[in-house]
Amino acid sequence: MAERQKIALIAHDKMKDEMAAFARHHQRFLEQWQIVATGTTGARVHDACPKLDVLRMKSGPLGGDQQIGAMIAQEEVAMLIFFVDPLTPMPHDVDVKALMRLAILYDTPMALNRATADRLLPVITE
């Protein structure tokens, strides 16, 4: 098993401000990790926290969710934080389901909202 040194950050369009705020709030902790993120989410997180090591994948609908899913399957990701907008239908919903399935299959902690992410992040190193 590979050492899980990455935290994955993904946010639906209406949740990107919340993800940037989350990253700012937890910046000191996140600086210890390589952050992998889908394209626009990664740009927003990097703009909010320039000191973070953010590796940007493609946009979610263009395959970014699947790129992060591959990292989960390689057991490189310690935690998936995915701020989901439950009120907006997503055209690439099947990609999102596949990503979540991989996180479940590989027993990767997954937070789908801010409250869960705030509580899980501090214990990820235990």
Curated annotation (Swiss-Prot):
InterPro entries named among the record's database cross-references? Methylgl_synth, Methylglyoxal_synth_AS, MGS-like_dom, MGS-like_dom_sf
| Domain MGS-like positions | 1-126
Q: Which SMART domains does this chain map to? A: MGS
Pfam families xrefs = MGS (PF02142)
- Any one annotated GO CC term: cytosol
The protein's UniProt keywords, in alphabetical order, are: Lyase
Its GO biological process annotations read: methylglyoxal biosynthetic process
Asked if Repeat is a keyword of the record, the answer is no
Q: Which reaction does it catalyse?
A: dihydroxyacetone phosphate = methylglyoxal + phosphate
Would you say which domain of life the source belongs to?
Bacteria
The family note in this entry says:
Belongs to the methylglyoxal synthase family.
The name of this protein is Methylglyoxal synthase
